[in-house]
From Swiss-Prot:
Pathway per the UniProt entry: Isoprenoid biosynthesis; isopentenyl diphosphate biosynthesis via DXP pathway; isopentenyl diphosphate from 1-deoxy-D-xylulose 5-phosphate: step 5/6
Binding residues for [4Fe-4S] cluster: C298, C301, C344, E351
Gene: ispG
GO function term, MF aspect, one: 4 iron, 4 sulfur cluster binding
Cross-referenced Pfam families: GcpE
Organism: Solibacter usitatus (strain Ellin6076)
Protein name: 4-hydroxy-3-methylbut-2-en-1-yl diphosphate synthase (flavodoxin)
Amino acid sequence: MAVKPRRNAVVVDVGGVKVGGTHPIVVQSMTNTDTADVASTVNQVMALARAGSELVRVTVNTEAAAAAVPKIVDACAAFGVRVPIIGDFHYNGHLLLKKYPECARALAKYRINPGNSDIGRKTDDNFRTMIEVAIENRKPVRIGVNWGSLDSALLTRMMDENSLLPEPKDAREVTLDAMVASAVQSARAAERHGLAHDQIILSAKVSGVQDLIDVYRALAAVCDYPLHLGLTEAGLGSKGIVATTAALAPVLQDGIGDTIRTSLTPMPNGDRTEEVIVSQQILQSLGIRSFTPQVTACPGCGRTTSTFFQEMADEIQTYLRVQMPSWKATHPGVETMKVAVMGCVVNGPGESKHSNIGISLPGTFEEPKAPVYVDGRLMTTLKGDRIVAEFLEILNEYVDTHYAIAGEPELVSGD
């Protein structure tokens, strides 16, 4: 199924990054450091940004965290990293934003959870205060509903109303309906308090794959605010990656979604940037955006008893990802390049011909030579112990020939 045209959402400017409309779907991430620890948070924000995160969210839960925010923003800028930083507020955001105006000014957006900001009560002073600070500082907000902290009064009322229907919905359906209602009603309340329509982004986070698909389809049908997609918590490792992909792909194919995050639970001392790479890969696999040249490699079988093709595929993919920060500025379009590293003659030549550059390594009982294809045609055949280095030379030459801006010097390849 082809990806449907994007839903027509209003455009929200988040620190210079346009979200919604026909603008590219934005990849965002979140730190897991103590925000009050400026050095650790700066290091992680920069790592996430350099991995490709276009927006980075930080927890602002204490006075120390709020006081640290301007220092974090300034330190990142001093290192040349100007990624917009979003403040994540729960329970006490109204107090922190008022007491620390420099924090309010430094942040590019405020995330507000209507389930813990008094929205919907007779008095919504906490919510109103945060909206007023956003208006004063010309900042957008994301009104983020979580099913784990859904407004209990709203849910109870909707459950009671549902019980009176001739054919009541099940509890799951009512809960998802309540999430949509909470998001939309909160957005309308923000507008009543004076926030502009194009300063609001919505999200409705759940942990179940089918729940996410259903709630976002319902939310998209009743509003034109940009939508931020993601599971509340995806889980560890492959489970988290598969769950996020299974949840986001159908929604994105429907043309729904303007920003995404992969909420992976990192392994102890794991690399936080993995969530950025997974989000990018989801968008690139669907053909929605391109971030880095893709390496196609066969899974291996009895014909490929050597691990050389696996090691080479990993080395080439790593090389491409390392090169992308510099290539992004000097070689526009290189992110769409396709590279194939195949392990035997069965699919090697055919897959290589479908790539911009491909190599078919020898499998079991095959001659020890590796044909290289460029734009579908056999270019050369490599042999010996310098196959990887020679293939990288061909790859670099192709990149310079096809993508370099006129006048840019050629890359010097290394072994």
